């Protein structure tokens, strides 16, 4: 009899476990269906966003050309500087002796509502472990330049279309693809327009970061050396004489290590009104450099890493973490005479401790996700004590 009741209890327990398991499976399936529906909706919205991005960028450029600059007053660079610019120029201050404020993902604007819903749902089901970053939003490139930003970062994704090769400026081509400057050529044209109307501006650097991991559908392609050389051509054709190339910086030196050993970067005066384009370290960096190790034929300066500090072609180095930069920059900047980029924060996180390290490290390009905004409603801003560029010496 006891065995009989034991079997009954065991059967009841098994039935309960089966019901619990089935309930869990049902919940997982429901979550999966919800996420799949949101994912599909995001893809559809992302596809519609592409044309919207292009239309908005074209309209913005037309506005700049035909209305914005008609009665335009150039930006007051001195009001943005933590030092007297003319005195610095007169004393021969060099480009690598000035710190400039930049922005991270300078093209980014609010995502589609569908993508926002997808990311917030993922975050909810993952108990807050997924950082949605859906509130991240930057002003237009022109607005950022007006406010004193002198380093811009542009992510580039290659797309083959019926009309040819295009280079798209966005974060993720199929989902998170909203952008204030979706076409690379038009983005460069916008920057060139601002530069032409501010001929004495502090030197501008543009970081071009090719996205290596791309799902090859809808014409999107993995970045290659051939595509990199096409970007070079677009840069030269669009920026024209405003572009300062590696060859311009190198002059008659044997290589860039020789230039750095001589502590002979171009002066602030010689780089004023100029634009330099920097190729973020990527899969094609080595082959891009190998085309000419003196960089005499390339339009972009390769941005390399700490381990490349003594190479003959190294000029700009990525050292994003302020903690690391504080330790390594004495060698990179004081001894190797390199220009270093460091990130002061990483949206949505920031801290006084990280900002203190960013201020201490001495990097010449400090990028932030919390710059001044055109609408002036931000409760939190990172800058150089109210200024946008400062002397390092």
Segments (PLM) and residue ranges:
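N-terminal Lys/Arg-rich, disordered targeting/topogenic segments
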Residues: 1-19
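Catalytic cores of phosphodiester-bond hydrolases, prominently lipid phosphodiesterases
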Residues: 21-24, 28, 32, 36-393
């Amino acid at each position: 009899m006891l065995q009989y009741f034991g079997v009954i209890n065991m059967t009841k327990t098994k039935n309960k476990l089966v019901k619990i398991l089935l309930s869990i499976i049902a919940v997982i399936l429901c979550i999966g269906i919800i996420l799949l529906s949101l994912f599909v909706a995001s893809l559809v919205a992302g596809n519609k966003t592409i044309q919207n991005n292009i239309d908005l960028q074209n309209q913005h450029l037309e506005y700049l050309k035909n209305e914005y600059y008609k009665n335009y007053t150039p930006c007051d660079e001195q009001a943005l500087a933590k030092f007297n610019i003319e005195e610095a120029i007169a004393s021969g201050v060099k480009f690598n002796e000035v710190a400039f404020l930049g922005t991270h993902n300078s093209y980014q604007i609010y995502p589609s509502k569908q993508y926002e819903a997808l990311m917030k749902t993922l975050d909810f089901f993952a108990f807050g472990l997924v950082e949605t970053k859906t509130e991240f939003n930057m002003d237009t490139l022109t607005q950022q330049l007006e406010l004193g930003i002198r380093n811009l970062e542009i992510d580039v994704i290659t797309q083959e279309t019926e009309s040819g090769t295009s280079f798209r400026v966005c974060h993720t081509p199929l989902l998170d693809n909203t952008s204030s400057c979706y076409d690379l050529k038009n983005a460069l044209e916008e920057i060139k327009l601002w530069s032409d109307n501010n001929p004495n501006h502090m030197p501008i650097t543009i970081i071009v970061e090719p996205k290596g991991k791309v799902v090859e559908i809808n014409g999107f392609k993995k970045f290659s050396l051939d595509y990199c050389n096409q970007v070079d051509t677009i840069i030269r054709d669009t920026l024209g004489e405003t572009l300062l190339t590696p060859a311009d910086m190198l002059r008659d030196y044997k290589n860039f290590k020789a230039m750095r050993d001589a502590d002979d970067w171009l002066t602030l005066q010689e780089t004023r009104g100029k634009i330099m384009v920097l190729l973020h370290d990527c899969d094609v960096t080595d082959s891009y450099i190998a085309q000419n190790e003196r960089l005499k034929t390339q339009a972009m300066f390769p941005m390399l890493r700490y381990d490349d500090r003594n190479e003959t072609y190294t000029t700009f180095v990525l050292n994003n973490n302020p903690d690391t930069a504080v330790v390594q920059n004495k060698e990179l900047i004081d001894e190797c005479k390199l220009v270093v980029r460091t990130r002061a924060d990483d949206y949505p996180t920031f801290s006084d401790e990280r900002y203190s390290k960013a201020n201490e490290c001495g990097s010449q390009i400090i990028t932030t996700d919390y710059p001044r905004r055109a609408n002036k409603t931000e409760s939190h801003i990172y800058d150089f004590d109210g200024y946008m560029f400062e002397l390092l010496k």
